[in-house]
Amino acid sequence: MAKKIEAYIKLQVKSGSANPSPPVGPALGQKGVNIMEFCKAFNARTEKMEKGMPIPVVITVYSDRSFTFETKTPPASFLLKQAAGLKSGSSRPNTQKVGTIKRAKVQEIAELKAADMTGADVEAMTRSIEGTARSMGLVVED
């Protein structure tokens, strides 16, 4: 018989550096999950990724306090900032542009995020990522 699911916990944790401090500790502690077990498993799964990259993770907590977790691809905004070499996006994206990014790079990001996105095809996902870039103050050029 399948285990009864008690909760889903969604967090963004930096790759290779999960530790019991907030936000991980309190979120898992409330549900009675073994925090160190999660931290060790998460760090092992993300050790090959660039250190410090924010990784969205969905933790499924079962009624017997066991858990499973699924890692997703980094947020599009993080990948865009990394590709454009920026620390942060524009505070006024419609009037103040902070950088440019090539459409080919945007398409590459869309293909990387394809597993997590709900787009019809790569072209639609590319347009979605372009919209994210524009809302950050980036200019998308051919």
UniProtKB/Swiss-Prot annotation:
Protein's GO biological process: translation
GO molecular function terms noted in the UniProt entry: large ribosomal subunit rRNA binding; structural constituent of ribosome
Pfam families: Ribosomal_L11, Ribosomal_L11_N
PTM info: One or more lysine residues are methylated.
InterPro entries, alphabetized: Ribosomal_uL11, Ribosomal_uL11_bac-typ, Ribosomal_uL11_C, Ribosomal_uL11_C_sf, Ribosomal_uL11_CS, Ribosomal_uL11_N, Ribosomal_uL11_N_sf
Record's keyword annotation contains Transmembrane: no
Assembly and interaction partners: Part of the ribosomal stalk of the 50S ribosomal subunit. Interacts with L10 and the large rRNA to form the base of the stalk. L10 forms an elongated spine to which L12 dimers bind in a sequential fashion forming a multimeric L10(L12)X complex.
Role: Forms part of the ribosomal stalk which helps the ribosome interact with GTP-bound translation factors.
The protein's name: Large ribosomal subunit protein uL11
Species for this entry: Shewanella amazonensis (strain ATCC BAA-1098 / SB2B)
